[in-house]
């Protein structure tokens, strides 16, 4: 339903927050047959028969009935409110709808063992509350387990913080509607604060919003490249952000921990990248001191958030409950009804710098401690970076003694063979194709002198490679768009965007960046063979690469990838440096020949 409703609002150009709120609330009240006498938040949003938007409301209700023939629930409202957050805001704020099953699991884990007496005055917070889904479920849990009224729970027990005004408003709306469904028609005193949680460590922070017994939620995931400069500056005030380029969710670990009372519990669904990434190194240092009791339920390649390429885990912490072990379990099918089987892993056996290899810990630890790590055994190279592969890389449609022929939308161009090299995309090695079938041609406007690659001068290009020069001129406008138009520092307009991997050692062991089955690496003896989009181990020592090939093609290495590498929902595993660099190559002793 959500996508159809969003398309309808877009088609009607209904972008004003208040108008959208009024439509959603009025529709829900009408479809639920609610009678409101006292709640002024909801009454103030209702569209009556005399309202100019009444016809729009009737049309909107008919759309809902069409798209959603079953009765509309409060969960539908949460989902709708989260869904209509603009795509631009999602990039900046990391707002996303958290499925109810996940919210319920986190809340029950944090509250189920709490004595009823403590629940009577517990303080529970969501410090990045969005539209209030977690807070709504906390309120329901407390009401069902204590008999307290929503009025009392809202005033004394639940607290929300969000940077967006519309999120604060919608949280109050949803909590009001929840109470109305249970016949509590009142004006409520809410503890929902509009503020940037990153300001927690400032003197101006509202002290009502700290010293919590429980914190639950889904901290915002915003990739570091999309984090505003001002926000980055705030993040650097937190110890957990002092490595790599941390994403926005990272500081919420430290903030939530510091906001808790001693013995307080934290339950997050969050990205699992902190377990192994450089960006998570400072977080690992922070938690490995053994001050708190920590459990991680890792979903690995299972995607909890539909249509989102995000990989997550459940993270639980009890503050100042010392433990020298981390509790880790894997759940790769998303079934939250299954009791996790946690493995206890000693912190002093973990390497915070290189990342935590937690899955099947003992087996992986053995593979990472016997021999020479791949990262030290052999140099790896990524491919060239032209920043316009479609200009430089082609499959000839014909050839003769002197030229390859390149077909483009502008016509057919002869390209001098002398300026071309063979190039491959080694990612294609994971498919059932022959090596020869994936060879392409690369226009290589460089000459190699004394181990250095230098661009061929334009005057030489015109004279020696006139046909290639003519073709490149036809692409000049396209080439000028590289690096967002900032190409003035290129040695010439037809130079590649980057100079990486222009010179490679003679021997190359080629393999894909992602694989869904055991590898079959290709070892090539060709100093001029170039690479794009994939990865290769390179060396002038053929025997070294032969040994490495036998290891990478082995079932043992594949089992290591399955246990340790970053998984994807499509069944693929990553072969990036961070995923494989710690796997050890066995030391092979040469026998003495008598």
Regions found by a protein language model. Name each.
Residues 141-145, 176-178, 231-235, 283-286, ...:
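Glycine-rich, phosphate-binding/catalytic loops in enzymes
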Residues 37-41, 46-55, 338-353, 430-453, ...:
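Short, compositionally biased low-complexity segments
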Residues 85, 111, 115, 143, ...:
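Hydrophobic alpha-helix feature that most strongly marks membrane-spanning transmembrane helices
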Residues 1-163, 167-170, 201, 219, ...:
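Class I S-adenosyl-L-methionine
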Residues 101, 129, 136, 163, ...:
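Signature of N6-adenine DNA methyltransferases within the class I
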Residues 365-594:
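Polybasic, glycine- and aromatic-enriched phosphate-binding surface used to engage nucleic acids
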């Amino acid at each position: 339903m959500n996508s159809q409703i969003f398309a309808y609002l877009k088609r009607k150009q209904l972008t004003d927050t208040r108008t959208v709120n009024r439509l959603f609330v009025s529709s829900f009240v009408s479809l639920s047959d609610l009678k409101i006498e006292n709640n002024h938040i909801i009454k103030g949003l209702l569209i009556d028969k005399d309202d100019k938007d009444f016809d729009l409301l009737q049309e909107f209700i008919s759309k809902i009935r069409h798209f959603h023939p079953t009765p509309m629930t409060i969960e539908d409202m949460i989902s709708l409110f989260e869904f209509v957050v603009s795509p631009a805001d999602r990039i900046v704020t990391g707002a996303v709808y958290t499925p109810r099953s996940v919210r319920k699991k986190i809340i029950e884990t944090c509250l189920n063992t709490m004595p009823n007496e403590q629940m009577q005055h517990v303080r529970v917070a969501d410090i990045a509350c969005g539209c209030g889904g977690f807070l709504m479920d906390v309120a329901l849990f407390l009401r069902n387990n204590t008999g307290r009224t929503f009025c009392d729970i809202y005033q004394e027990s639940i607290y929300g913080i969000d940077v967006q005004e519309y999120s604060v408003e919608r949280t109050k709306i949803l909590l009001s509607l929840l109470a109305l469904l249970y016949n509590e028609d009142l004006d409520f005193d809410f503890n929902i604060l509009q503020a940037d949680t990153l300001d927690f460590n400032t003197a101006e922070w509202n002290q009502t919003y700290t010293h919590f017994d429980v914190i639950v939620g889904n901290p915002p995931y915003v990739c570091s490249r999309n984090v505003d400069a001002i926000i980055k500056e705030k993040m650097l005030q937190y110890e957990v952000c002092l490595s790599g380029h941390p994403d926005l969710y990272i500081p919420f670990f430290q903030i939530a921990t510091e906001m808790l009372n001693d013995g307080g519990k934290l339950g997050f669904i969050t990205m699992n990248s902190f377990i192994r990434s450089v960006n998570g190194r400072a977080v690992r240092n922070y938690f490995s001191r053994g001050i708190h009791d920590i459990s991680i339920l890792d979903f690995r390649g299972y995607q909890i958030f539909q249509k989102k390429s995000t990989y997550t885990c459940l993270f639980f912490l009890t503050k100042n409950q010392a433990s020298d072990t981390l509790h880790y379990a894997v759940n790769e099918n998303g079934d939250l009804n299954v009791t996790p089987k946690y493995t206890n892993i000693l912190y002093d056996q973990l390497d915070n710098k290189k990342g935590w290899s937690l899955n099947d810990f003992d087996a992986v630890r053995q593979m990472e401690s016997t021999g020479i790590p791949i990262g030290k055994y052999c140099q790896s190279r990524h491919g060239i970076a032209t920043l316009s592969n479609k200009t430089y890389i082609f499959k000839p449609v014909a050839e003769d003694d002197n030229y390859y022929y390149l077909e483009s939308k502008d016509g057919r161009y002869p390209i001098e063979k002398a300026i071309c090299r063979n190039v491959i995309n080694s990612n294609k090695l994971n498919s059932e194709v022959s090596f020869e079938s994936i060879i392409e041609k690369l226009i290589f406007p460089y000459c190699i002198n004394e181990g250095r690659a230098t661009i061929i001068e334009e005057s030489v290009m015109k004279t020696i490679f006139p046909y290639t020069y003519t073709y490149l001129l036809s692409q000049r406008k396209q080439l000028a768009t590289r690096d967002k138009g900032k190409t003035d520092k290129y040695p010439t307009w037809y130079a590649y965007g980057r100079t990486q991997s222009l010179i490679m050692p003679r021997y190359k062991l080629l393999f894909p960046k992602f694989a869904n089955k055991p590898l079959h690496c290709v070892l090539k003896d060709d100093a001029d063979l170039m690479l794009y989009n994939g990865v290769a181990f390179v060396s002038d020592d053929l025997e070294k690469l032969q040994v490495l090939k036998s290891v990478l093609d082995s079932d043992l290495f594949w089992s290591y990838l399955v246990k340790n590498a970053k998984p994807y929902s499509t069944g693929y595993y990553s072969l990036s440096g961070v995923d494989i660099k710690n796997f050890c190559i066995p030391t092979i002793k040469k026998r003495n020949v008598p």
